[in-house]
């Protein structure tokens, strides 16, 4: 997969945003880390897919509610309502990126250590239902 330099930086910014957001959660919802994670994540998405596609992605009719929740949650985090902002922003992230969860689960199943765990007959139906993976009834 060939990426331009801007897209490589976008991947780094997105990953950094994810890490800062995760560290913000681990430090009991630290406002600065959560806000920095949001900013880095948005910059990363912008650099990866470009300005026009970013605008189209966030303003699709089926993604508007997720976009609104994400932005309201980020705004509440900036206003020091970090826990409520985190909950609302998480709902927005699910609304925006919920379609990708099936792809993520399939990718994780191809990994050496976690793949057999996610493919175990007792765990696989639960993970498939949570991720929205459609399985043929055969």
UniProtKB/Swiss-Prot annotation:
Residues 1-8, 53-67, 134-138 are cytoplasmic. Signal peptide: none annotated. The keyword Transmembrane applies. It comes from the Eukaryota. The chain crosses the membrane at residues 9-29, 32-52, 68-88, 113-133. It is found in: Golgi apparatus membrane. Pfam families: Got1. Residues 30-31, 89-112 are lumenal. One of its GO terms (cellular component) is Golgi cis cisterna. The keyword S-adenosyl-L-methionine does not apply. Its main location: Golgi. Keywords: Golgi apparatus, Membrane, Protein transport, Transmembrane, Transmembrane helix, Transport. Disruption phenotype: Lack of GOT1 is lethal in a strain lacking SFT2. It is a multi-pass membrane protein. Belongs to the GOT1 family. This is Protein transport protein GOT1. It comes from Saccharomyces cerevisiae (strain ATCC 204508 / S288c). The lineage of its organism: Eukaryota, Fungi, Dikarya, Ascomycota, Saccharomycotina. The gene is GOT1.
